[in-house]
Every structure is written in structure tokens, then in C-alpha cells.
Amino acid sequence: MTDAFDRLKKRSRTPIAREGSLTTGPELSDRPLQLLPREFETFCDRYAVHAGDVIEAALDLVLLDPDLQQRLLQRLRQGNGSDRVWLGTACPRSWQQQLQQQAQDQGLSEADLLQEAIAQRLDLVLGQTTLREEVTLLRQELDQLKRKLHGW
């Protein structure tokens, strides 16, 4: 299809936990991703996307949304195994303890340390291009295709 879409499809393929998931509202581009249980596979099937791509999109949203960071940290602290979810992958209690210890050692809040870890992950996955830029390119290319199809 389009170059930007192809780049999105070639990203890393991150395994996903069965419970603990990400989904959106009716308009894919208008609603932030939210952590919801047991709907991840349905979401991926409905929109024909790979779990890794959705997780990477969530990373960008977590960076932009302090409330989402806090909700994610709250889920990390919960004792229920299905709720110990970090960006769609199972998060062991030892990871939570490591996060708390690193935050203390570096004199940072857990949210700041988590944001830094997410930023580093984004750099690895996306190079220096943010997902926002990819989405902008996709929308521009989609608009061009619509104009061609409808003869605008």
C-alpha cells in the first residue's frame, strides 16, 4: 500500500499478554488508547493490525498523556496477575520492584523513570521518527487516495 503504512507494518512484533489490553473508541484516530481487559485480540482482528503496532502507538500516547502514565503505574502496582500489564506485555512483580528501586536511586519519580524508559523504547523502535509524524503522513496519503478515488 503506502510507504508510511509499509513502515508501520515493518515495526517490531511484540508478544502480547492474553489479558490486559489496549483498545480505542469508534473513531480510531480520535480517541486515546485505554487499558481494557480481554479485548485486545478483538481490536486487532477488527482493524487488521498487529499487536506490536498497537503497543507502539500506545507508547507514544503514554508519553503524551500524564493521566495515562498514572493509570499504567497504578496497574503495575496491583496484585492481580492479569492487571500487572506494561504496554501489553506481562509485567512481573520484580520489574515493579526494580522500577521503584531505580527511581529511588536516581532521585526521580516512578512516572519520570517510566517516561524515560518509554522514550528510549520509542527511539529504538521508531528511530528518530515519532509515531505522530507517521500518523500525519498516513493521513496525508489517505487524503490523497480519497481525492484520487472520488475525483476531487
UniProtKB/Swiss-Prot annotation:
Highest taxon in the source lineage: Bacteria
Upregulation: Transcription is reproducibly circadian, under control of RpaA.
GO BP of this protein: carbon fixation
Phenotype seen when the gene is deleted: Loss of McdA oscillation, carboxysomes (Cb) have much larger size variation and cluster, forming irregularly-shaped foci mostly near the poles, with smaller foci elsewhere (Cbs are usually regularly spaced along the central axis of the cell). Double mcdA-mcdB deletions have a similar phenotype (32 degrees Celsis, 80 umol photon m(-2) sec(-1) constant light, 2% CO(2)). At 20, 30 or 40 degrees Celsius (60 umol photon m(-2) sec(-1) constant light, 2% CO(2)) Cbs lose regular spacing and instead form large aggregates, increased level of RuBisCO at 20 and 30 degrees.
Key words, A-Z: Bacterial microcompartment, Carbon dioxide fixation, Carboxysome
Subcellular location: Carboxysome
One GO CC term on file: carboxysome
Keyword Cytoplasm on entry: no
Record's subunit section: Self-associates, interacts with McdA probably via the C-terminus of both proteins. Homohexamerizes. Probably a trimer of dimers. Interacts with most of the shell components of the carboxysome (CcmK2, CcmK3, CcmK4, CcmL and CcmO, but not CcmP) via its C-terminus.
Domain notes: The N-terminus (approximately residues 1-18) is intrinsically disordered, and not necessary for hexamerization; its net positive charge modulates liquid-liquid phase separation (replacing Arg or Lys residues with polar Gln decreases phase separation). The central domain has a stable alpha-helical structure (approximately residues 19-121), dimerizes and drives phase separation. The C-terminal domain (approximately residues 122-152) probably has 2 alpha-helices and is responsible for hexamerization.
More details: A type 1 McdB protein.
Function: McdA and McdB together mediate carboxysome (Cb) spacing, size, ultrastructure and probably inheritance in the cell. Together they prevent Cb aggregation. McdA is an ATPase that forms dynamic gradients on the nucleoid in response to adapter protein McdB, which associates with carboxysomes. The interplay between McdA gradients on the nucleoid and McdB-bound carboxysomes result in the equal spacing of Cbs along the cell length. McdB may have an additional function in cell divison. Stimulates the ATPase activity of McdA, causing McdA to be released from DNA. Incorrect positioning (aggregation) of carboxysomes results in reduced CO(2) fixation by encapsulated RuBisCO, which leads to slower growth, cell elongation, asymmetric cell division and an increase in RuBisCO levels.
UniProt protein name: Maintenance of carboxysome distribution protein B
Gene, per the UniProt record: mcdB
